[in-house]
Amino acid sequence: FGVNPNNYRKADFWDLRNLRPPYWLDCDEHYQFEICQLTSKEIFGFQTSHQIATNDLPKKASPIKWKIIHETLRTWGENVYCLSSFKPDNTKDQVIAVSSFFGMEHNSVNGGKIPMSRVIKCGKYAKFHFVGHKEQYQQFSNTIYMCILPKLNLIRREGEDIEYFHLASVQKQQNNESIVDLYYYIPVL
């Protein structure tokens, strides 16, 4: 492969074409996708950060993230964006620092102004649609990165992953479990 994992994570782009997916991934899974151009858009919300050990990747999803998404959808009463960036932690080996911004298109909730904003950067993105249980979502995300992007010859460029959660996610139920409905955008070259 020609580069160590730490330097790979620090690169401006991630070329996953030469990686072999783990045995537990179903690379025959097909997800609806399209290549699109996004325009810049300002969203308003709040920032969170956490760390995850690289040996917990890619099977482990943050339970805190799901709680935040569910509560934000319920409280704000509208669709929610989650912009996430990933980079090696500067102080610890084998740790990824994850920064997420949760936001919406309006700058106020219940009459109160939201002071923090972030701009979704314009550019080329691979857009995927997911509807299913949150437990299935991690498999979806892993399959996109480890199987679908390489199969399509797409290289992830620097930028934030964008998840756009639909309000209906809070209301949909199947077997007493919430169904997640979202679009997932990955910045690509």
Predicted features along the sequence, with ranges:
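A solvent-exposed interaction/effector surface
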Residues: 1-189
